């Protein structure tokens, strides 16, 4: 079904919602239809309906790794607002995907649980962390995942174990399908030093990354054995700007919105960086999720 087709939804939706309000980049035009779901049953109903009508849609969480188009999105944006957590054993916790990943890491480390200290300061949701296999250095989400619950195209809830999740460096199976991540179960351990570890990681992030300006975090994946930020800096592009988009003077793997950046300016800046590095024999892949106005 075309996104322009007038459709009657059997649930409440909002129309022409500006996506810049749902992106940490503060960029993006209006979505045709927009809905925040707060429960599994609500998500099941929406997903089943959209799939059965072959209606184009995307799933977003806190929008911390999304670059929306200036024109918006010609389709349905399903925003995940399902939050909550529960311990299923002394050191195993099930967390719903709309929960803040950073807040989860802070809460657990403050309570003496280790495993997710690295999450403190990562601005996305638990679902986003699973989707991207978020991490820092040699620590990532995959290392502490026990299982993930999803909602499939039929509205059914399925569970995947770690081996079925296709985890790799900043990647997972979910980047190649449109399954709705419902929850993740994490394996933790007890560690009295966890709160100090989390604080040290957060301090280093605040010192090295431009948290005061809108961005989506790292724009590029690190090439094997190297640092994208270091390579961009060495190429002389640190601080380079195009319109309202700028390669951060603080961390060269961040593009920041200095006030009125457009998605087109950000994409052009990404291309400039890629072309410059390619001339040196280095291919940089985007880590940011670039969402087109219309799905292919």
Curated annotation (Swiss-Prot):
SUPFAM superfamilies: FAD-binding/transporter-associated domain-like (SSF56176), Uridine diphospho-N-Acetylenolpyruvylglucosamine reductase, MurB, C-terminal domain (SSF56194). Cell wall formation. Residues 26-191 form the FAD-binding PCMH-type domain. One of its GO terms (cellular component) is cytosol. Gene3D superfamilies: 3.30.465.10, UDP-N-acetylenolpyruvoylglucosamine reductase, C-terminal domain, Uridine Diphospho-n-acetylenolpyruvylglucosamine Reductase, domain 2. One of its GO terms (biological process) is peptidoglycan biosynthetic process. Pathway: Cell wall biogenesis; peptidoglycan biosynthesis. The keyword Ribosomal protein does not apply. Keywords: Cell cycle, Cell division, Cell shape, Cell wall biogenesis/degradation, Cytoplasm, FAD, Flavoprotein, NADP, Oxidoreductase, Peptidoglycan synthesis. Belongs to the MurB family. Pfam families: FAD_binding_4 (PF01565), MurB_C (PF02873). This is UDP-N-acetylenolpyruvoylglucosamine reductase. PROSITE patterns: FAD_PCMH. It is found in: Cytoplasm. It catalyses: UDP-N-acetyl-alpha-D-muramate + NADP(+) = UDP-N-acetyl-3-O-(1-carboxyvinyl)-alpha-D-glucosamine + NADPH + H(+). GO terms for molecular function: FAD binding; UDP-N-acetylmuramate dehydrogenase activity. Its cofactor is FAD. Transmembrane segments: none annotated. The active site is at residues 170, 218, 287. Its EC number is 1.3.1.98.
């Amino acid at each position: 079904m075309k996104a322009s087709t007038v459709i009657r939804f059997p649930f409440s939706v909002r129309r022409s919602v500006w996506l810049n309000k749902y992106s940490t980049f503060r960029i993006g035009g209006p979505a045709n239809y927009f809905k925040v779901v707060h429960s599994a049953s609500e998500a099941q109903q929406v997903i089943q309906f959209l799939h059965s009508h072959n209606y184009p849609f995307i799933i977003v969480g806190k929008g911390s790794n999304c670059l929306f188009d200036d024109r918006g999105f010609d389709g349905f944006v399903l925003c995940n607002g399902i939050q909550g957590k529960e311990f299923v054993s002394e050191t195993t916790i099930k967390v719903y995907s709309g929960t803040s990943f950073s807040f989860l890491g802070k809460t657990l480390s403050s309570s003496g649980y280790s495993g997710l200290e690295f999450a403190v300061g990562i601005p996305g949701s638990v679902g986003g962390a699973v989707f991207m296999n978020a991490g820092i250095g040699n620590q990532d989400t995959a290392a502490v995942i026990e299982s993930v619950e999803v909602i499939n195209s039929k509205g059914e809830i399925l569970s995947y174990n770690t081996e079925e999740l296709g985890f790799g460096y900043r990647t997972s199976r979910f980047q190649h399908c449109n399954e709705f991540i419902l929850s993740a179960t994490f394996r933790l351990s007890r560690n009295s030093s966890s709160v100090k570890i989390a604080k040290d990681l957060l301090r280093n992030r605040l010192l090295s990354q431009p948290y005061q300006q809108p961005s989506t975090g790292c724009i590029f994946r690190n090439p094997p054995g190297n640092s994208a930020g270091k390579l961009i800096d060495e190429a002389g592009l640190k601080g380079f700007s195009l319109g309202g988009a700028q390669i951060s003077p603080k961390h060269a793997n961040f593009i920041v919105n200095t006030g009125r950046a457009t998605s087109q300016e950000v994409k052009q800046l990404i291309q400039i960086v890629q072309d410059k590095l390619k001339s040196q024999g280095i291919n940089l892949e985007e880590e940011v999720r670039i969402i087109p106005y219309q799905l292919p």
